A protein has these predicted regions:
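Conserved acid/base catalytic micro-environments in cytosolic active-site loops
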Residues: 1-308
Length: 308
């Protein structure tokens, strides 16, 4: 917090996989750190560690450059900026939670439908923790099933889910293999596992695997988005938030090809304009929105989807 206030600079947090370590790392990210990397265990090779460290350092450097550029820009009058926002969470508490760069606007409404097959999938990476604390708490409690991939190490994803759950109307928790998706529930992919959605007789069902990383990432957004395109087709709304690299771009194109809707965070609010940019280069983005308007964009998309 002191660094962020007096000496702003890119910060990479290296933390242990303990509960206390994960909680501290999450607090650091909320205070301004760009990335978190778990301390390696004895089973990781030097080559794998070097590649992972280099990837994270590049991401943090890119985030630092981007934040400086955003700070230097004059304020855009079309983007609502706030330091906090009040949300009535699932417990009925009118609690205030911090959003360091952007806040939410008016209430988001999603229309409930019979025989609902809609599916919301969200992907994010560098800067994504802050972005998710803006989007997820804005979703109403009747939101269709939601699955999130945030590039984050194992054990940290559970802490992220708990923190989002405390401030949200939907129930947020870490996904478990075989879990059936239901309305009003948002599942966070566990760190270290790819997550896919299957269309089964029970409904949409989660499958967790530990197949090789994609784009140096596990979980990978591409795995989630591609599975959603196959499982839900035109009933899918895919959202790609801030992040370095190209993960999620091909998956978003697959969603669009299947008839689904796609939303990407606009460059004006991205900490790292990598993943949304890559999707744009593939012409896979139907709508670009600054972060404060993403939740409303999601509602508009879901409300327009036809139930069959």
């Amino acid at each position: 917090k002191i660094l962020a206030k007096h000496h702003p600079m890119p910060v990479l947090v290296v933390s242990s996989l303990t509960e206390d370590g994960s909680e501290t790392a999450m607090q650091c990210m909320e205070a301004g750190a760009s990335e978190v990397l778990s301390k390696p265990d004895g089973s990781m090779s030097v080559g794998a560690l070097s590649a992972q460290l280099a990837h994270h350092v590049k991401a943090v450097y890119a985030a630092g450059r981007r934040e400086k550029a955003l700070t230097a820009q004059p304020h855009n009058t079309n983007v609502h900026v706030a330091t906090s926002s009040k949300t009535l969470n699932k417990h009925g508490d009118d609690k205030q939670h911090a959003v360091s760069t952007v806040g939410r606007t008016s209430e988001v409404r999603i229309t409930s439908k019979l025989n609902d097959k809609r599916l919301l999938v969200i992907g994010s990476s560098t800067g994504g923790v802050k972005a998710l604390t803006c989007v997820i708490p804005s979703l109403p409690k009747n939101c269709p099933p939601t699955v999130v991939v945030q590039h984050i190490p194992s054990h940290f994803s559970k802490v992220l889910a708990q923190r989002l759950n405390d401030m949200s109307q939907v129930n947020v928790r870490e996904a478990e293999d075989g879990e059936v998706l239901t309305e009003g529930v948002c599942l966070i992919a566990p760190g270290g596992f790819h997550i896919a959605v299957l269309n089964t007789p029970k409904g949409y069902q989660v499958r967790l695997t530990q197949t090789p990383p994609i784009h140096f990432c596990r979980p990978a957004v591409d795995v989630l988005f591609t599975s959603a395109a196959k499982a839900a087709g035109s009933q899918t709304t895919a959202v790609l938030l801030t992040g370095m690299g190209s993960d999620g771009a091909q998956g978003m194109l697959n969603v669009m090809t299947a008839g689904g809707d796609t939303i990407a965070e606009d460059e004006s609010t991205c900490i790292v304009y990598g993943m949304p940019r890559a999707a744009g280069l593939l012409n896979a983005v139907k709508t670009k929105l600054p972060l404060p308007h993403i939740a409303h964009g999601i509602a508009k998309s879901l409300n327009q989807l036809e139930v069959y």
